[in-house]
């Protein structure tokens, strides 16, 4: 179904989507099993990377042409989507759109879990289960950056090999 392009409402921008992350919440939303269900029709895709094409009233820190990543809730698997300016993060030129689109949910979830909830301290031991997946791999990276001794566990050798490549960074 064709839908109208989003408009930049006050406090928002429109982003030309170059890449969208597909994460576990997206799967659950499509299956109708997530904690919220957007009204139909909707497009999944909660995290995106792209270029701002329109800036809404009251947005001072962003301009057309800026490369950004954002958490948009849903609607990211589209040519264009809208995002609140306060949720945007700059996408460095050194990071491609594909990597940028996978960044916010995995790294944000991990940082929140380790820093805010777990209060991980330098020198502590961190056991990462599911170490070959998106959040697991970021937990290895962030845990090491925070000075923890990281132990990785995964369900098969292929996933362990991914984890080992990160542990020995």
Labelled PLM ranges:
Residues 50-52, 65, 91, 110, ...:
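Residue-level signal for nonpolar/aromatic packing positions in well-ordered secondary structure
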Residues 23-29:
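Adenylate-forming
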Residues 28, 39, 61, 67-130:
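NAD(P)H dinucleotide-binding glycine-rich loop of Rossmann-like/cofactor-binding domains
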Residues 57, 93, 155:
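Short, conserved catalytic or interaction motifs in soluble domains
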Residues 4-22, 33-75:
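Glycine-rich beta-strand-centered segment in the early N-terminal region that forms part
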Residues 101-103, 107-166:
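Mid-domain Rossmann-like dinucleotide-binding core that forms the NAD(H)/NADP(H) cofactor-binding site
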Residues 2-5, 49-51, 69, 80-82, ...:
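Conserved hydrophobic/aromatic beta-strand scaffold that supports enzyme active sites
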């Amino acid at each position: 179904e064709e839908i109208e392009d989003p408009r930049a409402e006050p406090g928002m921008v429109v982003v030309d989507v170059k890449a969208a992350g597909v994460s576990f919440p997206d799967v659950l939303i499509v299956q109708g099993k997530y904690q919220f269900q957007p009204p139909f029709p909707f497009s999944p895709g909660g995290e995106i990377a792209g270029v701002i094409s329109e800036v809404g009233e009251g947005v001072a820190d962003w301009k057309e042409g800026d490369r950004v990543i954002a958490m948009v809730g849903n609607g990211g698997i589209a040519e264009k989507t809208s995002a609140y300016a306060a949720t945007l993060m700059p996408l460095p030129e050194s990071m491609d759109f594909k990597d940028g689109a996978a960044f916010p949910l995995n790294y944000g979830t991990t940082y929140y879990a380790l820093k805010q909830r777990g209060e991980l301290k330098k020198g502590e031991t961190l056991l990462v289960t599911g170490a070959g997946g998106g959040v697991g791999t970021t937990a290895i990276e962030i845990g090491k950056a925070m000075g923890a001794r990281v132990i990785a566990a995964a369900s098969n050798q292929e996933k362990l090999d991914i984890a080992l490549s990160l542990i020995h960074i």
